[in-house]
Amino acid sequence: MGGKTVTRADLAEAVYRKVGLSRTESAQIVEMVLQEVCDAIVRGETVKLSSFATFQVREKNERVGRNPKTGEEVPISPRRVMTFKASNVLKSRILRAHQTRKPSKEATASS
């Protein structure tokens, strides 16, 4: 499952190759898009990228948790968390890609 990690530089290179802008312009566009997404999330806005995903900031109330070692109750402060929800289109693409992979050695050995 581990595969390659895609970086900002990889995204800029893809824009450069596919759109035909200079490498500098491509890197600037990637930076600007990521900055806009980050700024909107920091402002507490929901960012919905159609056919990709939704990023949303949620408020979590204060609650009581437990220390798993001791069982002692520990207060957990209220906080804001960001959630990422993949779109159905992205989920379908991931599922199709998974289904078209070669079967593993374990799967073929048990057949």
Swiss-Prot record:
GO biological process: DNA recombination; positive regulation of metabolic process; regulation of DNA-templated transcription; regulation of translation
InterPro entries from the UniProt entry: Hist_DNA-bd (IPR000119), Histone-like_DNA-bd_CS (IPR020816), IHF-like_DNA-bd_dom_sf (IPR010992), IHF_alpha (IPR005684)
Record Pfam families: Bac_DNA_binding
Keyword Lyase recorded: no
Molecular function (Gene Ontology), one example: DNA binding
Organism: Chelativorans sp. (strain BNC1)
Keyword Flavoprotein among record annotations: no
HAMAP family referenced in this protein's UniProt entry, alphabetically: IHF_alpha
GO cellular component, one term: cytosol
Superkingdom: Bacteria
Record keywords, A-Z: DNA recombination, DNA-binding, Transcription, Transcription regulation, Translation regulation
Role noted for this protein: This protein is one of the two subunits of integration host factor, a specific DNA-binding protein that functions in genetic recombination as well as in transcriptional and translational control.
PROSITE patterns: HISTONE_LIKE
Name under which the protein is recorded: Integration host factor subunit alpha
Family: Belongs to the bacterial histone-like protein family.
Assembly information from the UniProt record: Heterodimer of an alpha and a beta chain.
Record SUPFAM superfamilies: IHF-like DNA-binding proteins
